[in-house]
Regions:
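Positively charged n-region of N-terminal signal peptides that target proteins for export
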Residues: 1-4
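Short low-complexity stretches enriched in small and charged residues
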Residues: 54-60, 101-106
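Active-site alpha-helical elements of protease catalytic centers
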Residues: 57-70
């Protein structure tokens, strides 16, 4: 019995028991800062553009590969990288994604709510720019700013005013596409 009492006393001394009145009140926590950009894809997972077998750039597919990796679909991203290439149009890409069993959503009507949803849910989306001749990943969209990941220069994000980006996107066919899987968890605060 003495050993048990001695062990409990020893544990209490080591654990540092305090009375409820002795504990300092919790300091108010700062509001966590949202990760910027919302889709903060590590450099190693960003897919650069490549030349397809038809001699065209593969920006739509490179963007899809990056977004699939962000959403944890690495094998699917590798399959897309190995089996798809060249330029693509919305209906053709939809057909290929359907055949591959990829879950996705897209718009071709310039609906800004789709962009907001894709960024709010941290999925991001591919969007057309330059008159519909190029696709980049929209990785952030807030009240003032948009961030793009261009597969022709994956080293850094391109920040542009929101309204400038939306006007460019709408003038470029208003096509946006994203895979629909769970995105990566946010960085710890």
């Amino acid at each position: 019995m003495r050993r048990i009492v001695l062990a409990v006393l020893l544990l209490a001394m080591v654990a540092g028991c305090e009375w409820p009145g002795d504990v300092a009140p919790l300091a108010p926590k700062k509001r966590p800062v949202a990760e910027r950009p919302a889709v903060n894809l590590p450099l190693a997972l960003r897919q650069s553009n490549w030349w397809g077998t038809g001699g065209q750039g593969s920006c739509t597919w490179a963007t899809m590969v990056s977004l699939l990796r962000w959403q944890g679909r690495y094998r699917m991203a590798d399959w897309v990288r190995q089996n798809c290439g060249d330029g693509e149009w919305p209906d053709d890409m939809a057909q290929r994604l359907d055949e591959a069993g990829v879950r996705y959503a897209y718009v071709t009507n310039g609906d800004v709510k789709f962009l907001e949803w894709a960024c709010r849910t941290r999925r991001g989306c591919g969007i057309t720019i330059r008159g519909g001749q190029h696709m980049v990943a929209l990785v952030h969209l807030d009240e003032k700013w948009a961030a793009l990941l261009d597969d022709n220069a994956v080293e850094q994000y391109i920040w542009v005013p929101r309204e400038t980006l939306i006007a460019e996107w709408k003038a470029s066919d208003g096509w946006a596409v994203t895979p629909i899987y769970a995105p990566a968890a946010p960085l710890p605060q």
